Amino acid sequence: MTIQAFIEKLKKTPETITFTETIATVESNYEFTPTAFQNGNQHNGAGENSGSCKLFAFAKIQQLTQAETLACFGAYYFEEVLGDPEGTNHQNIRNFMKSGWDGIKFEDVALVPKA
C-alpha cells in the first residue's frame, strides 16, 4: 500500500487499520535500522520491539496525531489494550497513551525512505 493510501484509510476508518498492514506499509516504503528508543518510562534497546520502533518512527515522519498513531497498532490497541484497561501487556502502547509524542525519543534514525 502506498503511504498516501494508508494515510487516507487511517483518517477515514482508523478502526479498520491492522498492525500487519501498518508494518507492511512501512517496510515497502522505508529502510529500517534497529535503534534504541525511549517511550515514556520504558527504554527499548536496538532490535527490541522493532515493530513499535518502526511504527513510531513512521508516525513521527508522517506527523500523525497520538490517536492516529495508536490506531496504527490495530487490534493490539482497539481490542487488547482498550479491552483491558488495567492490563500490563503492550507496554509501548500503554506508555504512549500516557506520555504521547513528548515521551518518544529515538537514539538514532530508524527509517530512511527507499530510493
Label the predicted regions:
Residues 1-5, 113-115:
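Basic/polar N-terminal segments that are highly enriched at the extreme N-terminus
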Residues 13, 17, 29, 33, ...:
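Short secondary-structure junctions and interdomain/linker hinges
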Residues 25, 29, 72-76, 96:
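Short acidic/histidine-centered micro-motifs embedded in hydrophobic/aromatic stretches
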Residues 41-91:
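Amphipathic protein-protein interaction modules
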Residues 88-115:
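Long, compositionally biased
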